[in-house]
Amino acid sequence: MICMHFSVLLQESIADLNINPEGIYIDATFGRGGHSKAILDKLTSGRLIAFDKDLDAIDYATHNFQNDNFEMVHASFTYIYDYCLQHNLLGRVDGIIMDLGVSSPQLDNANRGFSFTHDGPLDMRMDISKGLTASQALEELSVDELTYIFKVYGEERFAKKIALRIKGYIAENGSITTTHQLAELIRATIGKREKKNPATRCFQALRIYVNDELKDLEILLESILDVIKKGGRVAAISFHSLEDRIVKQKFTSLINPKQETNRIAKMLPQDNSQVKMKWITKKAKANQDELSQNVRSRSAILRVVEKL
């Protein structure tokens, strides 16, 4: 299957990175290389290191990116700090781009199990070489654990009801092995109460759990100050409120530390020695032209910071 993939907020994110042609850049989420290509097009003697744990992304990079100044690393972006440590790059990186969440090719490939639009095996792993599938997770998790995952990661108000139905179904009928099976079970449990598919939130929650997405994001954000140089920039594109909240809170804590402390501390003068970054773009969304080309860009939020 050939999947059309549009890199969301491409022009805005690359412009905000203010590419140095001789600089060192990291694409934390290669995907199909839209942001990587845009960065490489602006580099002369500079270099780009890209990370992705999806084997399909690695295969795509191998066949389509032969630049001498490009390196593809099959690893989660949680490995970026260790990579930079091993290659003497800590404090030398000019910019990092992270395009979070699931990519269009992943959603459109039924065999990956990310979407209820196409029936396929209930997998949902970004890296199919390891870890539990979504189907296996549903079997292993308790009702309380599933309820927590659906409520916290999916912001699903019927979390307990859905969790009970899923575990009851598994007890009576065995594994839930396909995306349509799970989506239909959720629909039958809560009905269709709004425009979007009733399975949307639970699919998001299960994917986040299977791939440990929020914990991985926190690990990456904790490392950015050590990785980039002074004047270096970090651009983060998020697609749902949980990701964006983590990005915003981390960036804010580095820009205005007193906001992250108690009420009394907020009344005190700013201690500029604690300010590590400044906003380049506090919040940007896709324009109407991009929305008309790619409906998936409607929820995207871009935030960009620079190290002081």
Curated annotation (Swiss-Prot):
It catalyses: cytidine(1402) in 16S rRNA + S-adenosyl-L-methionine = N(4)-methylcytidine(1402) in 16S rRNA + S-adenosyl-L-homocysteine + H(+). Belongs to the methyltransferase superfamily. RsmH family. Pfam families: Methyltransf_5. Its main location: cytoplasm. This is Ribosomal RNA small subunit methyltransferase H. One of its GO terms (molecular function) is rRNA (cytosine-N4-)-methyltransferase activity. One of its GO terms (biological process) is rRNA base methylation. Specifically methylates the N4 position of cytidine in position 1402 (C1402) of 16S rRNA. One of its GO terms (cellular component) is cytoplasm. Keywords: Cytoplasm, Methyltransferase, rRNA processing, S-adenosyl-L-methionine, Transferase. S-adenosyl-L-methionine binds at residues 33-35, 52, 81, 99, 106. It comes from Francisella philomiragia subsp. philomiragia (strain ATCC 25017 / CCUG 19701 / FSC 153 / O#319-036). It is found in: Cytoplasm. The gene is rsmH. It comes from the Bacteria. Its EC number is 2.1.1.199. It is an enzyme of class 2 (transferase). InterPro entries: RsmH, SAM-dep_MeTrfase_MraW_recog, SAM-dependent_MTases_sf.
